[in-house]
């Protein structure tokens, strides 16, 4: 009987610890996502800077990205196909000021946002995604239903 009383007494303690661990894990995921986004922005910057020093953009686009993709994939695993490297390049070109990149959004959010040509719409979706805590899937759904245009 005493054991049941002890368990009931510690239930708020257990709940508080669980909540702390859940929040800690959530913060960890957000921190990792933020660092990934910053890293991909830097990769995009390096690609653009290298491209600007090259003589032939067509050569760069095909050969260099394919070589980078093969080497990075071999060393770091998936996530570095030529398509994703092009997105990183476009990410830097679209957001040339690093501080303008919002840490609340994941790389998947940004890949979705990069498909938008309208800069005002893109900024509106960024603000809404952060304010409304949209997942990347929810953001994609809102864009596909032309939520901004309504």
Regions found by a protein language model. Name each.
Residues 1-150:
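Basic, low-complexity intrinsically disordered segments
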């Amino acid at each position: 009987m005493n054991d049941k009383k002890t368990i009931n007494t510690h239930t708020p303690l257990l709940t508080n610890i669980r909540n702390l661990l859940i929040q800690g894990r959530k913060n960890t995921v957000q921190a990792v996502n933020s660092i990934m986004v910053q890293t991909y922005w830097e990769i995009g910057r390096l690609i653009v800077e290298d491209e600007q020093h090259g003589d032939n953009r067509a050569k760069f686009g095909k050969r260099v990205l394919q070589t980078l993709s093969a080497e990075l994939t071999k060393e770091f695993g998936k996530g570095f196909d030529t398509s994703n490297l092009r997105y990183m390049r476009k990410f830097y070109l679209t957001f040339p000021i690093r501080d303008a990149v919002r840490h609340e959004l994941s790389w998947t959010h940004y890949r979705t946002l990069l498909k938008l040509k309208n800069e005002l719409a893109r900024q509106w979706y960024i603000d809404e995604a952060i304010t409304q805590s949209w997942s990347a899937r929810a953001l994609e759904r809102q864009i596909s239903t032309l939520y901004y245009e309504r």
